Amino acid sequence: MEMRQGGGFATLTPEILLGPLNDVEQKYAPARLFVAGPMEIPLPSPRVSLVGSRKASRRGLEAAREIARFLVRKDAIIVSGLAEGIDTAAHTSALNNAGRTVAVIATPLDRSYPAGNAGLQDKIMREHLVISQFEIGDSVLKQNFIFRNRTMALISNATIIVEAKDDSGSLHQGWEALRLGRPLFIWRDVLDDPSVKVPQDMLKYGAIRLDELEEILPSLPQNESLLEIVQ
């Protein structure tokens, strides 16, 4: 874990960041969020989370890059957790394709985990937005990552599970997205893996199998870039 000298951090409520929350959204919403970066507040839409395995396969990484590239070309903001694997692929693909990205992290803003992503975190802080619900000085606990995924589901208009096993932390976000009534997409490769059972159960509760990228668009808040292909 890498420490950094912080500055320019702001403290916001979720309502300031996102707009009014309903009772379901308020249940697990953090009381306050710490943010760093120049992105406009309230956050513009659409915002789509890409989540998945830290120890991602080459195929999973390629899928994350492809999905992120497609979405930023439709003016969507890529949200992810700055972890190794799928998260890193999603953030970097957004940046490499002149898109926007938001990192929701499980550490205070003055720390980086993994340490190898410190440079990426700094770049997103300078040019986009990094969000944490953990105050500077807070301990970094295992449960932080579950709380982070709940918050990321709240921030996002939709979540896509790109790659996962049954013990993957990204599944916490999937269940929270369903609880919130937000679209949850599960990439086809996850559902075609016979060793993975939990995502199959998610389909029974409203998750959507994602075979073609265009299938995401009708579920997102509409802007001109999206309307060009939806109509």
Predicted feature descriptions by range:
Residues 4-231:
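Glycine-biased, small-residue-rich flexible motifs in mid-sequence functional cores and linkers
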